[in-house]
């Protein structure tokens, strides 16, 4: 028989009805719950009607949304972020000694370390994920530009050789110990011949030096090594700057110097290049030994031929165009395309790093509200699954009640935005080989994505470039012509292969959120101790400050901003928001009245119910998305999570769920009328409840009550009923009980009707645990009133979450002057402390 909505509300005790001691135990009856489920069409029976796979914006939890490429994306500009290395002494000079907990958390990131037991290496062709098949070339260049921007900002290392890397920025102490110096091992890239190398040809100057012997002639013979080996001398009179010497990922290539009066013919240069390629294939250099290629003898048989350079891009300048869309026309636009590669200001030794990657990258919109800027997505998912998975450390996430207890105060609030928060935390160089990103170069990437013949790679391995025009096409020509207006001569630089490792903590790693949460929570703990009359709280990169007046808040903001900037933390002043008394934080609006969800979440729920169909089976994957949205707001409704249990059951069984009209109306009424989650108050417990399978007992001050059930009930159900009776008849918001299930406030495993009603009755009620021997309601629950036991003095303290996110800061030592850097409107004795 169908059930009307009014009768259903009355059944759940949401409206006035029968006496509580009679109506509430009936809700635990299994037969009644079954009949109500039949009346609401919630039996979860298999249906033959086709499932609905899309409800409004929800299309299933596992459906992959199509990414949209924006050719006009702007790459964000990153400053040279350098967190102070002597962080702990610097803070102690500001605010006095730190606690051991604060020191422990700060040491985790100075530097951070990541050493997985196993790492998979992938070919460079998989460095850039092909998520935009229609914009392959544009996406490639934007990713290359983004990676170079991060490298120049000191976020990435650039792999120079198997055992060396270069970077920009200020070196840390642990990098000084591994530093090569400021002179790069290779200055002359492939295909770019030195303009200052006038003089005789280099025949006889290069000797085969595989075992580390010094060359007998030329500038390469005067570079002494350090005693430890592997470090290039910075004090040498003739540093490693050979003319026309290229160091590639596979070896060294020597090119002859170009001079107007040079007698070296171009046929020899072609043979020289081929010999260099074959030699570099046979021998891979190490960090201790340089291998110099012996140049072949001169030949005069092939005069007039152009040299075949090892640079794919520059070879188009000397070749004949194959068509109107040949890349030769683009390369001829400039006479000087610049070097094939750049080097950082500093060089360091690194562990053996192969010419491969460990994670792919691609670009997306910066956020749903900003499609003009791009964001680099790094996929290091290999460390979260399979044989290379890593067990990430767990850290506390504040729940709704803890946030409300902590932040629901009559303070004025301001939120700070930390610019590129993850890129503030330095990584040890030994972690670089596990966090590699890059690309294989333009020709190999285009050939792979377009599924064309990979002739360039094959012929390049053989030392020839006969199929130079294999990738010439109208699409590539038009794309490069348009990109030339944006990048200019950088088209050449970005067309080369690139391998980079992270110098700062990447966002795509499971370890990063833990490190950032520990770091920001330690900083806020220091701020709270320095300004005990104020409030500072952080979760990840969200930092909020609170004070009792607007003037006080502005002074606090100025002092904290100066302190953070002194630490090397960059803030985004454009995103600093002043909220007044209502703080918007983590999706909630938190004020003196309590917490409520933000308006944009309410709008999503209203749209969800508007699009939700009735009497049609909905795919359980779509139900997962719907429940994910409704579950976030469930604590603000009358019946909480218990009202969603029919949908949860279908999801667990992988069955479609059908919304009846009454059930949809019930949920819509629940979510259109929200109640704030109030802040809990400390106090002494005066009301106690206890139950047995056959009876219940209450103690309310000097008053005692007892009763019996019509039939024996499970002990947890009986304890829950006793707590509901105590809340309704005493009106107390603090109740003592000895049942752990009632204390947990998780009522989703009780009979559905009872769980919904109990959630509404016990809303806003706090529980405190009392042992059974000390529970004064234990005797009344067994039917024995007897003498009244003295009430135990139980103090309830509201929870503010785990100590890793919020810890009570010790006061400033008395022998130090006050660290408040402004005239505080509060008296020193009126120090406000978080609840």
UniProtKB/Swiss-Prot annotation:
Signal sequence annotation: none
Activity: how regulated: Activated by host HSP70 and HSP40 in vitro to be able to bind the epsilon loop of the pgRNA. Because deletion of the RNase H region renders the protein partly chaperone-independent, the chaperones may be needed indirectly to relieve occlusion of the RNA-binding site by this domain. Inhibited by several reverse-transcriptase inhibitors: Lamivudine, Adefovir and Entecavir.
Disulfide bonds: none
Domain Reverse transcriptase: 345-590
Annotated region described as Terminal protein domain (TP), given as residue ranges: 1-176
Region (Disordered): 211-235, 258-288
Lineage: superkingdom: Viruses
Binding site for Mg(2+): 417, 541-542
Site (Priming of reverse-transcription by covalently linking the first nucleotide of the (-)DNA): 62
Pfam families in UniProt: DNA_pol_viral_C (PF00336), DNA_pol_viral_N (PF00242), RVT_1 (PF00078)
E.C. numbers: 2.7.7.7, 2.7.7.49, 3.1.26.4
GO biological process: DNA replication; symbiont-mediated suppression of host innate immune response
GO molecular function, one term: DNA-directed DNA polymerase activity
Residues covered by region (Polymerase/reverse transcriptase domain (RT)): 335-680
Keywords: DNA replication, DNA-binding, DNA-directed DNA polymerase, Endonuclease, Host-virus interaction, Hydrolase, Inhibition of host innate immune response by virus, Inhibition of host RLR pathway by virus, Magnesium, Metal-binding, Multifunctional enzyme, Nuclease, Nucleotidyltransferase, RNA-directed DNA polymerase, Transferase, Viral immunoevasion
Spacer as annotated region, ranges: 177-334
Reaction(s) catalysed (UniProt annotation): DNA(n) + a 2'-deoxyribonucleoside 5'-triphosphate = DNA(n+1) + diphosphate; Endonucleolytic cleavage to 5'-phosphomonoester
Entry note about domains: Terminal protein domain (TP) is hepadnavirus-specific. Spacer domain is highly variable and separates the TP and RT domains. Polymerase/reverse-transcriptase domain (RT) and ribonuclease H domain (RH) are similar to retrovirus reverse transcriptase/RNase H. The polymerase/reverse transcriptase (RT) and ribonuclease H (RH) domains are structured in five subdomains: finger, palm, thumb, connection and RNase H. Within the palm subdomain, the 'primer grip' region is thought to be involved in the positioning of the primer terminus for accommodating the incoming nucleotide. The RH domain stabilizes the association of RT with primer-template.
Protein family according to the UniProt entry: Belongs to the hepadnaviridae P protein family.
HAMAP family tied to this protein: HBV_DPOL (MF_04073)
Miscellaneous: Hepadnaviral virions contain probably just one P protein molecule per particle.
Function in brief: Multifunctional enzyme that converts the viral RNA genome into dsDNA in viral cytoplasmic capsids. This enzyme displays a DNA polymerase activity that can copy either DNA or RNA templates, and a ribonuclease H (RNase H) activity that cleaves the RNA strand of RNA-DNA heteroduplexes in a partially processive 3'- to 5'-endonucleasic mode. Neo-synthesized pregenomic RNA (pgRNA) are encapsidated together with the P protein, and reverse-transcribed inside the nucleocapsid.
Protein name: Protein P
């Amino acid at each position: 028989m169908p059930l009307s909505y009014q009768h259903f509300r009355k059944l759940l005790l949401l409206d006035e009805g029968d006496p509580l001691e009679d109506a509430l135990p009936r809700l635990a009856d299994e037969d009644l719950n079954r009949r109500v489920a039949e009346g609401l069409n919630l039996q979860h029976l298999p249906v033959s009607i086709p499932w609905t796979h899309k409800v409004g914006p929800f299309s299933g939890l596992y459906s992959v949304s199509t990414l949209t490429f924006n050719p006009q994306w702007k790459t964000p500009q990153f400053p040279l972020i350098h967190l102070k290395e002597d962080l702990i002494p610097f803070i102690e000079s500001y605010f006095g000694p730190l606690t051991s907990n604060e020191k422990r958390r700060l040491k985790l990131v100075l530097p951070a370390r990541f050493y997985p037991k196993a790492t998979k290496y992938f070919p460079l062709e998989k460095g850039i994920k092909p998520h935009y098949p229609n914009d392959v070339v544009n996406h490639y260049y934007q990713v290359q530009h983004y990676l170079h921007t991060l490298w120049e900002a000191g976020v990435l290392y650039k792999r120079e050789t198997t055992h060396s890397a270069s970077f920009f920025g200020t070196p840390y102490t642990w990098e000084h110990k591994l530093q090569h110096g400021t002179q790069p091992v290779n200055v002359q890239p492939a295909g770019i011949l030195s303009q200052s190398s006038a003089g005789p040809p280099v025949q006889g100057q290069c000797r085969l030096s595989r075992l580390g012997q010094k060359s007998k002639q030329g500038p390469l013979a005067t570079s002494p090594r350090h005693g430890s080996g592997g470090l290039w001398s910075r004090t040498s009179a003739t540093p490693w700057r050979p003319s026309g010497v290229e160091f590639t990922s596979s070896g060294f290539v020597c090119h002859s110097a170009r001079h107007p009066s040079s007698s070296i013919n171009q046929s020899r240069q072609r043979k020289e290049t081929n010999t260099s390629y074959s030699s570099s294939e046979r021998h891979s250099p190490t960090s201790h030994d340089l291998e110099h290629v012996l140049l072949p003898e001169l030949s005069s048989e092939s005069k007039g031929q152009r040299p075949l350079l090892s640079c794919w891009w520059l070879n188009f300048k000397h070749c004949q165009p194959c068509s109107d869309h040949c890349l030769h026309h683009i390369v001829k636009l400039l006479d000087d395309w610049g070097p094939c590669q750049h080097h950082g200001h500093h060089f360091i030794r690194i562990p053996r790093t192969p010419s491969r990657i460990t994670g792919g990258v691609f670009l997306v919109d910066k956020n749903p509200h900003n499609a003009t800027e791009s964001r680099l997505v790094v996929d290091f998912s290999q460390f979260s699954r399979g044989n290379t998975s890593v067990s990430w450390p767990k850290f506390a996430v504040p729940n709704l009640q803890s946030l409300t207890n902590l932040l629901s105060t009559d303070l004025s609030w301001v939120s700070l935005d930390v610019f590129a928060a993850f890129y503030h935390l330095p990584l040890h160089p030994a972690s670089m080989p596990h966090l590699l990103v890059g690309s294989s170069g333009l020709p190999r990437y285009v050939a792979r994505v377009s599924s064309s013949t990979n002739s360039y790679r094959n012929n390049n391995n053989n030392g020839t470039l006969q199929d130079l025009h294999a990738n010439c096409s109208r699409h590539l020509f038009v794309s490069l012509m348009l990109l030339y207006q944006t990048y200019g001569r950088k088209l050449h630089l970005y067309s080369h292969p690139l391998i980079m490792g992270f110098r700062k903590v990447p966002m795509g790693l499971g370890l990063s959120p833990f490190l950032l949460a520990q770091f920001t929570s330690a900083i806020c703990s220091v701020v709270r101790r320095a300004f005990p009359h104020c409030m500072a709280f952080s979760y990840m990169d969200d930092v909020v400050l609170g004070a009792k007046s607007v003037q006080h808040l502005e002074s606090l903001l100025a002092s904290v901003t100066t302190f953070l900037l002194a630490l090397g933390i960059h803030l985004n002043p454009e995103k600093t928001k002043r909220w007044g008394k209502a703080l918007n934080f983590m999706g909630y609006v938190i004020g003196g009245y309590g917490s409520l969800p933000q308006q944009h979440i309410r709008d999503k729920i209203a749209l969800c119910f508007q699009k939700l169909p009735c009497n049609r089976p909905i795919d359980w994957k779509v139900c997962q998305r719907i429940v994910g949205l409704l579950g976030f707001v469930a604590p603000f409704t009358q019946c909480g999570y218990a009202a969603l249990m029919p949908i949860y059951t279908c999801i667990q069984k992988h069955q479609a769920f059908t919304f009846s009209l009454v059930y949809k109306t019930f949920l819509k009424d629940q979510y259109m009328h929200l109640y704030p989650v109030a802040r809990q108050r400390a106090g002494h417990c005066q009301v106690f409840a206890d139950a047995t399978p056959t009876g219940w007992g209450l103690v309310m001050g000097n008053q005692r009550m007892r009763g019996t059930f019509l039939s024996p009930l499970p002990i947890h159900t009986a304890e829950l009923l006793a707590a509901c009776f105590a809340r309704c008849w005493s009106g107390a918001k603090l109740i003592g009980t000895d049942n752990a299930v009632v204390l947990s406030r998780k009522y989703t495993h009780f009979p559905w009707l009872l769980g919904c009603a109990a959630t509404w009755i016990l809303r806003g009620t706090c529980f405190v645990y009392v042992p059974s021997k000390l529970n004064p309601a234990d005797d009344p629950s067994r039917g024995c009133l007897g003498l009244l036991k003295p009430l135990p003095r139980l103090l309830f303290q509201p929870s503010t979450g785990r100590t890793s996110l919020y810890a009570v800061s010790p006061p400033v030592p008395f022998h130090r002057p006050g660290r408040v850097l402004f005239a505080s409107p509060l008296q020193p004795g009126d120090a406000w402390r978080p609840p």
